[in-house]
Amino acid sequence: ILKGIMDCMEQGPLTGSYARDVRVIVYDGKMHPVDSNELSFMLAARHAFSDAFKQAGPKILEPIYDLEVYVPADYMGDVMSDLQGRRALIMGMDSEAGYQKLSAKIPLKELANYSISLSSLTGGRASFTTKFASYELVPSDIQSKLIADHEAELEKDAE
């Protein structure tokens, strides 16, 4: 039973990503001398876990990073627009050593290719640092898309 549940958690019923912070309680079970074996218990556990997990109304979490961007004042508007398009939450701005320091929180997924984008926007005159901050809920519209994409991928693999 445990192996079936752990396998299901590793593959994640919603998007194929690891399911964390899950508590499972088995209330009842019977063993039949002919039909019971390790595989049947594992498959039953996987099926039960998947059904219960989806009924529990799970939410998808994404890693959020603290981002600090050091940018010349001339490029501040372009950099802020780019960050807002990446779902960043601007936390503040300061002036530091002739540069503007922009502080934000941003989903890790949105940092893909950020270095290239920032260099392109500023002619290579800006830099940034990141640090893991927390896990936050994915917005519901993005969660729905992630689930739909995963289901489509499963259907494609089944063909």
Task: For each feature predicted by the language model, list its residue ranges.
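Accessory interaction regions appended to the cores of large information-processing enzymes
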Residues: 1-159
